């Protein structure tokens, strides 16, 4: 099978094309979980671009429980193309500057994100088939995906890893109360994610 135009690699510059887009319950960047897995039951659907809607490309994927998604921080793109070496991570309350490479800030030289998600199912029926249903995603609706890889526990898990400043930062979770009338507006399967 021929490869779609992926661009050349001239002097280390590579052009990439989205292979898919993710459909989530987050139409804007506000409200999205800050990290993947923070809302483990929240499902999303991955819809492949036509050149990549080939069931053969997914053969063997059903044997994996988790996936890596490589994607673009599409809502954080700056028109001027500039980046800043220092950012203020929300994990530190937005008050302490840190080097961009010590953070997961979307404002990076190359605005690329990496998320670990749970694979719920592969659907081979429907107009957009095949599609993937995943859980625990931290992406905005319509986010372009550049690659999908299986999560390999024997090499991707590092129990001895340390978390730098993020490990010792305060937990900024808020207690949220949803009135029953508002909960009734949500499908029951999505209520568990709240």
What do these predicted regions represent?
Residues 1-116, 122-194:
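Glycine-rich, low-complexity intrinsically disordered segments
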């Amino acid at each position: 099978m021929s490869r779609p135009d992926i661009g050349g690699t001239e002097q280390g510059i590579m052009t990439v094309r989205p292979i898919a887009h993710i459909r989530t319950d987050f139409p804007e960047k506000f409200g999205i979980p800050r990290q993947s897995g923070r809302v483990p039951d929240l499902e999303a659907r991955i819809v492949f671009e036509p050149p990549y809607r080939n069931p053969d490309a997914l053969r063997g994927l059903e044997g994996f429980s988790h996936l890596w998604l490589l994607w673009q921080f599409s809502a954080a793109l700056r028109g001027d193309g500039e980046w800043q070496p220092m950012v203020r991570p929300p994990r530190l309350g937005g008050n302490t500057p840190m080097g961009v490479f010590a953070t997961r800030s979307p404002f990076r030289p190359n605005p690329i994100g990496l998320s670990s998600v749970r694979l719920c199912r592969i659907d081979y029926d429907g107009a957009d088939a095949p599609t993937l249903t995943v859980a625990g995603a931290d992406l905005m609706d319509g986010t372009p995906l550049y690659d999908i890889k299986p999560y390999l526990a024997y090499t991707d898990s590092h129990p001895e890893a340390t978390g730098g400043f993020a490990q010792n930062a305060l937990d900024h979770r808020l207690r949220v109360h949803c009135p029953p009338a508002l909960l009734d507006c949500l499908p029951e399967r999505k209520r568990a994610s709240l």
